[in-house]
Amino acid sequence: MYDKIKILTFAKGNFIESQQKLKNHLVSIGLTNQKHITDKDLPESFLSEYSEILSFKKGYGYCIWKPFIILEELKSIGDDEILLYIDSTDLPEKIFFDEVLKNFEQREYFFLNRGYNHGQWTKRDTFVLMDCDNQKYYNHVQLEAGVIGLKKNNFNIELVEEWLEYAKNKNILTEHPNISNLPNVNNFVEHRYDQSILTNLFIKKNLVSHRFGTEVIKYNYNQPKIY
């Protein structure tokens, strides 16, 4: 049933235990086509090119590795395969994967959200430097970048390439103070780095997302977050 889905995960430090738990959970559901990456698997060329950003402990370089590993794997899969990236700290129920398959009967991508406002969780520079500085973006729902499904096609490859390219700019990706001299949006809480960038691109391209709660995608972590 799930033979067209290829799972991709990443873990470092204390997250490796969660990755193993997710792996076992997925096998029990029937998802056996899996690739699990750790920081030890990242190529030297990546570590060298992104060494400055990777030096930030939060998200192990604000999760810049995420668009990188997704892009590499997306290019390598077969044309009829679905690449489904899942954060190691997420534990989706079987019903979730059934919904993913239904989605791919109509679309060649899958994004989800949890109902949070994008403007509250994105610093102003990320809007400004991506030419997204208006109410359309502030008021939109933010994606949950912990689960991303993509079929191999030029549109999706170019989307992830853009995501990675914007992530190279630390003024867009990181929590560095805004250089635009503009205040954050009202009710701003915190910047969501890779997720904020992906959401801007998602809105710009007029894509569609699905809302899921913790009853369908459970939290898979009970230790201090140490990368």
Describe every region a protein language model picked out.
Residues 1-227:
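Glycosyltransferase catalytic domains, chiefly GT-A lineage
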